[in-house]
Amino acid sequence: MKVAYIAGPYRANTINRTVENIRNAEKMAIKYWKKGYAVICPHKNTALFDGICPDETWLRGDIEIMKRCDLVVMVPGWETSQGSVTERDIAVKIGIKVVEP
């Protein structure tokens, strides 16, 4: 089974917007589960863990997981997220297929 990684904005100015970002990533994850992929959705893995560790800790860990995936799926609005831009750039650099549904 191929593995898809969901990349998109997480952080926001309000908790409501952060929850909305998590929900958007969740919807994309469900879409790819239905397509037959095993899906890693980092938004759900560390949802609302804010303040426990520096944000860089989460991003480094997510990138390690992403490197083992077959596909990176960009959630709409990814361009506004520095973390998502970094994830996309690394995926392209190491040859992981990137899609923008």
Which functions belong to the PLM regions below?
Residues M1-P101:
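Catalytic phosphate/metal-binding cores of nucleic-acid and nucleotide-processing enzymes, i.e., regions
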